[in-house]
Swiss-Prot record:
Membrane-crossing segments per the record: none
Species, as recorded: Manduca sexta (Tobacco hawkmoth)
Function: Arylphorin is a larval storage protein (LSP) which may serve as a storage protein used primarily as a source of aromatic amino acids for protein synthesis during metamorphosis. It is a constituent of the sclerotizing system of the cuticle, and serves as a carrier for ecdysteroid hormone.
InterPro entries given in the database record: Di-copper_centre_dom_sf, Hemocyanin/hexamerin, Hemocyanin/hexamerin_mid_dom, Hemocyanin_C, Hemocyanin_C_sf, Hemocyanin_N, Hemocyanin_N_sf, Ig_E-set
Superkingdom per UniProt: Eukaryota
Identification of the protein by name: Arylphorin subunit beta
C-alpha cells in the first residue's frame, strides 16, 4: 500500500484561489517627449539574452559607427580607449559577467564611458543599441543600468526591477527549471500533476509557486532567515545602491558627492546590518556571528542557483578559509585590517595628499573610502595595480569558488553578484566585520554632550504607536526574461507568459502620533528610530552597547508653533522607503497614459516599505521606538542623487553616529517608546506553497 501525502494547500493552487493583492501606488504625469525616450530606454532591457532583428534598436545598433561619431562624445579620449580595448578582444556573448573580476570590470567601465559621455540622448541611445547588439549581455546591462541612473538627461526615467531583468538571480534553480520545462513543452502535460508541483495556469500565463531556500541550501540555523535574505526587493535595493555609487566611481571625474562618499558607504551598511539584526532577534538567532581568516568558517551555503552557463559554487559548513590556495589572499586581508588599526593608534593618516585626523568626525569619509577601497581613496595619480580591494578579495575567498580558468571564465558564487550577495550568510558576517573596524574609529570621537543634544524650549510630551503587525502575502514577478523565444514568438513582441509567485513579508500600515510642546515658533527636524529592547538572552540592552543598532524609520522637518503641536505620521509617508516596483508590462500601459510610477522614477534606490518592520511573533516581539527632535539647518550643497541619505548638515544617523552616554539621552526633546511587533497568519512562508518534495509514508514493497 502506498499513501501519498499532499498539502491541502495544493487544492488552492489548482483552483488559483490565492491571488496576490494589488497595492496602490503613486504616479506622476510626464510629457510626450519623455514617454518616447522612456520607451526606448525600457525596450533595451527586454529579453536581453537574445536580439530581435525586428526591433528598432537592432537596425540602429547594427548600422551605428562609434568612430565616425566620435565628435558626439564629450570625452573623446575615454571613447577612444574603449575602442582600443574593444579591438583587442572583449568578453564574448553568453559568458558570465561579474564586476569583481578586473578584466571584466575594466571592459564594463569602458562601456559605461561610451554611454555616459554621449553628448545627447540620441547619441546615448545609438551607443546603447550598438552595445545591445554586439556586446556581452551581462556587461551591457551592468553599464546600462548605471548610465541610465547617472546621466542627467535620463534623470527621472524608470529602470525595471532587477528581478525582472535577471530572474535567474532571484529564484532558486528548481523553480527556474519548471519555467524552462513549461516553455520547452509549450505548456504542461497534466494540469493536476503540475498543480502538485506548484504550477498553475491563470488567464493566459503560468504561475510558479516558489519556496524560499530550506535546509538543503542553509545546512545551519541561517535557513530561518531565507524569507528576508532572499527577498527580491531587498536584493534589488542592494543592486540599486551599487548603481548609484559604484566602488570604481571617481567622484571628481563623474561629479559625485566626494566629501561624504565614505560616510554614505558606512551608513548604508550600518543600517543594513541593523535591519538584518532585527530579523535575527525575532527568529531567536541573536548576534551576527564572527569569524577568523585563520579558522574554519562555520556558516556553509549551498545555493540552488545557476546562471545560464554555470552552477553557483557551494561552501560547506566549517569550510577552511586559510587553505594553500588562499594563503596570499588571507595575508593581504589580515595586513589590510592591521594597517587600519595602526593608523588609528597613530591618531592620524598622511599620504596621497590627504591629512586625516581620526578625532575629527569628518574622518568617516576617509574611513569609509578605505574599507570600500574605492577610486577616491588614493586619487587618479595612483595606478590601479597599486590598489588591491579588500572587499573584492574577501568576497572571492569567502565565496569558495575555484580560481578562474582564464580571464573570462569563472565559476560564480553568490558573492560575485550584487543581485545575489545578500543570500549568503557570510555577506553579513563580512560587512559586520568591516563595521567593527569602523566602530574602532568611532571610539576616537567625543560623545555628544548633553548641551549639544538638547533643544531648549521643545519637549516631546508623548508618543503613541499603533499596533505593529506583520504578515506574509503573495507577490508575482515576471520571469519571462529568463527564457528564449522562437522567431515566431519574437515577432509577437515577446509574450510575458511566466510569473513566479512567492509569499513576502509585509506589515499593516501604522501611525506614530507625537505630542510636542514648544515655547516658540521654530523649524525642527523630527527623526523616528527603531531599536532592539532586549538581547537574544532576554536582558535589557544598554544604550551605550546598542547605539549602532538603531534603524532610521523616518526623517522630516516641521514648523512648530508656540504651544501644543500634534504630529501624526503614517508609515506610508516615511521618507526613506518606497512602493514595490511596477512590472514592465504595467509600465508600458502607464506610459500610454503619459504616466510613470512616482517611486520608480524618483525613489527607486530606497528600501521597500514592506521591509520596514521585522517579522513579529504571535505574542509580540519587543522593540523600542525613539523620537528625537532638534533644530533644522539645511545643507546647501547639491546632494542629488543622495537625498535619501543626506538631508541636513548633521552626520548620517545623528545622534547615533558615534558612541553615546546614556545619561545624555534623557532629555525633553527625546522620547523612548516600548512597542511590540506581532505577526498575523502563517508564521512560516513555506506553508503558503508546495513542499519541496512529495512525502511518502507506509511504503511497503510488493512481493
Amino acid at each position: 500500500m502506498k499513501t501519498v501525502i499532499i498539502l491541502a494547500g495544493l487544492v488552492a493552487l489548482a483552483l488559483g484561489s490565492e491571488v496576490p493583492v494589488k497595492h496602490s501606488f503613486k504616479v506622476k504625469d510626464v510629457d510626450a517627449a519623455f514617454v518616447e525616450r522612456q520607451k526606448k530606454v525600457l525596450d533595451l532591457f527586454q529579453d536581453v539574452d537574445q536580439v530581435n532583428p525586428n526591433d528598432e534598436y537592432y537596425k540602429i545598433g547594427k548600422e551605428y559607427n562609434i568612430e565616425a561619431n566620435i565628435d558626439n562624445y564629450s570625452n573623446k579620449k575615454a571613447v577612444e580607449e574603449f575602442l582600443q580595448l574593444y579591438r583587442t578582444g572583449f568578453l564574448p556573448k553568453y559568458y558570465e559577467f561579474s564586476p569583481f573580476y578586473d578584466r571584466l570590470r575594466d571592459e564594463a567601465i569602458g562601456v559605461f564611458h561610451l554611454f555616459y559621455y554621449a553628448k545627447d540622448f540620441d547619441t546615448f541611445y545609438k551607443s546603447a543599441a550598438w552595445a545591445r547588439v554586439y556586446l556581452n549581455e551581462g556587461q551591457f546591462l551592468y553599464a546600462y543600468y548605471i548610465a541610465v541612473i547617472q546621466r542627467k538627461d535620463t534623470q527621472g526615467f524608470v529602470v525595471p526591477a532587477p528581478y525582472e531583468v535577471y530572474p535567474q538571480f532571484f529564484a532558486n534553480l528548481n523553480t527556474m527549471l519548471k519555467v524552462y520545462r513549461t516553455k520547452m513543452q509549450d505548456g504542461v502535460v497534466s494540469a493536476d500533476l503540475a498543480a502538485q508541483h506548484g504550477i498553475v495556469k491563470e488567464k493566459n500565463y503560468y504561475v510558479y509557486y516558489a519556496n524560499y531556500s530550506n535546509s538543503l541550501v542553509y545546512n545551519n540555523e541561517e535557513q530561518r532567515l531565507s524569507y528576508f535574505t532572499e527577498d527580491i526587493g531587498l536584493n534589488s535595493y542592494y543592486y540599486y545602491f551599487h548603481s548609484h555609487l559604484p566602488f570604481w566611481w571617481n567622484s571628481e571625474r563623474y561629479g559625485a558627492l566626494k566629501s561624504r562618499r565614505g560616510e554614505i558607504y558606512y551608513y548604508f551598511y550600518q543600517q543594513l546590518m541593523a535591519r538584518y539584526y532585527f530579523e535575527r532577534l525575532s527568529n531567536g538567532l541573536g548576534d551576527i556571528p564572527e569569524f577568523s581568516w585563520y579558522s574554519p568558517v562555520k556558516s556553509g551555503y549551498y545555493p540552488l542557483m545557476s546562471s545560464y552557463y554555470y552552477p553557483f559554487a557551494q561552501r560547506p559548513n566549517y569550510w577552511n578559509v586559510h587553505s594553500e590556495e588562499n594563503y596570499e589572499k588571507v595575508r593581504f586581508l589580515d595586513t589590510y585590517e592591521m594597517s587600519f588599526l595602526q593608523f588609528l593608534q597613530n591618531g592620524h593618516f598622511k599620504a596621497f595628499d590627504q591629512k586625516i585626523d581620526f578625532h575629527d568626525f569628518k574622518a568617516i569619509n576617509f574611513v569609509g573610502n578605505y574599507w570600500q577601497d574605492n577610486a577616491d581613496l588614493y586619487g587618479e595619480e595612483v595606478t590601479k595595480d597599486y590598489q588591491r580591494s579588500y572587499e573584492i578579495i574577501a568576497r572571492q575567498v569567502l565565496g569558495a569558488a575555484p580560481k578562474p580558468f582564464d580571464k573570462y571564465t569563472f565559476m560564480p558564487s553568490a558573492l560575485d553578484f550584487y543581485q545575489t550577495s545578500l543570500r549568503d550568510p557570510m555577506f553579513y558576517q563580512l560587512y559586520n566585520r568591516i563595521l567593527k573596524y569602523i566602530y574602532e574609529y568611532k571610539q576616537y570621537l567625543q560623545p555628544y554632550s548633553s548641551e549639544k543634544l538638547a533643544f531648549k524650549g521643545v519637549k516631546v510630551v508623548d508618543v503613541v504607536v499603533d499596533k505593529l503587525v506583520t504578515f506574509f502575502e503573495y507577490y508575482d514577478f515576471d520571469a519571462s526574461n529568463s527564457v528564449f523565444w522562437s522567431k515566431e514568438e519574437v515577432k509577437s513582441s515577446y509574450p510575458h507568459d511566466f510569473k513566479i509567485r512567492q509569499p513576502r513579508l509585509n506589515h499593516k500600515p501604522f501611525s506614530v502620533s507625537i505630542d510636542i510642546k514648544s515655547e516658540a515658533a521654530v523649524d525642527a527636524v523630527v527623526k523616528i528610530f527603531m531599536a532592539p529592547k532586549y538581547d537574544d538572552n532576554g536582558f535589557p540592552l544598554k544604550l551605550e552597547n546598542n547605539w549602532n543598532k538603531f534603524f532610521e524609520l523616518d526623517w522630516f522637518t516641521y514648523k512648530f508653533v508656540a504651544g501644543d503641536n500634534k504630529i501624526v505620521r503614517n508609515s506610508n509617508d516615511f521618507l526613506i522607503f518606497k512602493d514595490d516596483s511596477v512590472p514592465m508590462t504595467e509600465l508600458y500601459k502607464l506610459l500610454e497614459q503619459n504616466k510613470v510610477p512616482h517611486d520608480m522614477s524618483e525613489d527607486y534606490g530606497y528600501l521597500p516599505k514592506r521591509l520596514m518592520l521585522p517579522r513579529g511573533t504571535e505574542g509580540g516581539f519587543p522593540f523600542q521606538f525613539f523620537v528625537f527632535v532638534y533644530p533644522f539647518n539645511a545643507d546647501s550643497k547639491d546632494l542629488a542623487p543622495f537625498e535619501a541619505f543626506i538631508q541636513d548638515n548633521k552626520p548620517l544617523g545623528y545622534p547615533f553616529d558615534r558612541p553615546v552616554v546614556d545619561a545624555y539621552f534623557k532629555q525633553h526633546n527625546m522620547f523612548f517608546k516600548d512597542v511590540f511587533v506581532y505577526h498575523d497568519g502563517e508564521y512560516f512562508p513555506y506553508k503558503f506553497n508546495v513542499p519541496s518534495h512529495v512525502m511518502h509514508s507506509n511504503v511497503v514493497p510488493k512481493h
